[in-house]
Amino acid sequence: MATDTYAVEVEGVAKRFGKQPALDGISLRIRRGEVYGLLGPNGAGKTTLIRSLVGLVAPEQGTVTVLGRRMPQLAVLARVGYMTQQAALYPDLSAEENVRFFGAIHGRENGVREALEFVELWDRRTSVVSTLSGGMRTRCSLACALVHKPDLLLLDEPTVGVDPQLRVQLWDGFRKMAAGGTAIVVSSHVMDEAERCDRLGLIRFGKLLAEGTVAEIKSRAGVDRLEDAFLKLSGVSAS
């Protein structure tokens, strides 16, 4: 398959923090137009892997290629949207001002209303971020990540604190973005969230334990539930 089919190519990536391996020889490929889930417990290495995709973490071994360019490459970041676990917002600015600022960074003046409507915050656009609830800040952070219509969208625990009804709507939106060719990487430790992805990478202790569709992973583990598959492939006995 041609390289330009892939939005992300990770080959043998390793990274340690002190003596602790955060990533241990991870290799994976993510296609354009694919929703790919990184599933694992807290501390598994999901965030470190995502940060390596935007050049915030430099691997000690291996290579990271994003949208056909070896990372880190500043020019690539204009085509990438990144939503961190902790909302990276300016608390004294309004929701609209935050989204407009992040759009301007990427040279995009339009799309602010569309992004805020996507996360159902247009009616609160004039609210100062410091007055918003945690869930609303999460949604504002998501709007900032997608306002410039990126080719690759990286979402680190994107629906924490978001109510179930809006979560469904957001996922419908992610699906439409993927259908338009955007590659989306979602990290999560929640099983029902992971089941919405086209393919999954199961991560524990910095290692990629298994990769494939939900059905393929369940079949490989010989179980009916994704949670049981993760435990079995992790070498942990289900109680």
Roles of regions detected by a PLM:
Residues 54:
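Helix-to-loop junction immediately C-terminal to a conserved catalytic motif
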Residues 62-76:
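Conserved ABC transporter NBD signature motif
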Residues 100, 104-124:
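Conserved ABC ATPase "signature" region
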Residues 153-157:
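Catalytic Walker B motif of ABC-type/P-loop ATPase nucleotide-binding domains
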Residues 211-212:
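ABC ATPase "signature
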